Amino acid sequence: MVFAVSTSSAPAKLLPGPIARLRVVSRTTVRPGVIFTHYRANVRGYSQAQEIYRISWGIGNTHVTLGSALLGTFHPAQETVDVHPISSLGAPAGLLGAINGDYSAYTTRSAYRNSGMLVKGRRIYNFGWGGPGVGYLPAGDFKIGSPRAQPVKLKLPNRLTATVGAFGALPAGSDQVGAYDTAGTVVTVPAGYAAFTVNSTAFRTMLSGNRTLRNPTGSDRSEPVAAFAFADPTSAATTKSLPIVGSQPAGAQVTVPATGTVLLAKVGGIAEVGLSALAASAKPVVDINGDAKGWSSVSDVMGGKPELVSGGVAISSRPAIVDSWQWTCGGGCWRPALMRTSSGRGSLILIGARSGSGLTMLSFARVLRQLGAQQAIGFDNNGSAEMYRPGHRPYTGYGYERWLPTATTLRYR
């Protein structure tokens, strides 16, 4: 027997799938348009009832914000985060709930490293491995894809490029620029350098990070790179054209304009020679690669895997990126996800049964689809699968909290 659930937080009629019976245990409106629902479901092939905890909201609600949270101190050299219980988020104003983040690698007893990409406030904490992830957009929206960070490159004549070696400091390489982007800052051009002023604030919103890379279309030497842009194999690349409005020699003092950026480059190097040629050309602009289409407004990213539902179709076989234990958990375990319905609602969702039992990933994907998912991505499962709501005991598979490095949060303002 299938129970139809007629509320704004669930489909008016369940789609076909493995749920044989669905009952609402409780429902609470936590903020206007934001609903917490506890369901209990009987799923075919499983003897125990599955508890479903769901926080849903209307995508486009300007009061709602999704984000990545680091639960402890970040250690840049190792790219690790000190682990803490998800309840350590506390109860700051506006926090409505959270679920655990990406799979993570144990490095020490107190610090873990996220497996996938981790970005918060346009700062890259983990570059990840190029696998699935979700980018958080304004108004409770999100974009699921396979984001990666590629260096921002200034396109110079003769098919050469320059990278951004530093913000507010001199670059390390001759094929790099140092970007001074704080409006009103007075930059004194040091000996051996030249300055170029561009009429663009693009540098102020670039992804910032720290990675040593080689630029094969530059000097092809290992150098620290500080500025990046989102790339995604499923999204079109973009280019930005930045007008060059002035150049200044060593000894000059240049004020960073309100709508511009000052770039410093070593005299005689690839970057300086190329920018000088562009500045003297009939069309003094320099092109850079921007964020992939749909990613420019993404502030935070949380890695996850796999994409459980895509285009309204649940996955039907184990992807190569998912190991057999993650796929089955020995018969089933607790599982979290972020999902979007065809009716335009987003949900943080956690599903599991008593004593840590739960669903296989295949069944989980089918259940999400039956609950209306048009798109969904999973995060770390089993003992790490948790949901937290301020003022409530965390929902966990074993009755206690794991210590975790990251979480996805839902806030209301």
Task: Go through each PLM region and give its residues.
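Secretory targeting and sorting signals
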Residues: 1-11
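Gly/Ser/Thr/Pro-rich low-complexity, intrinsically disordered segments
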Residues: 11-413
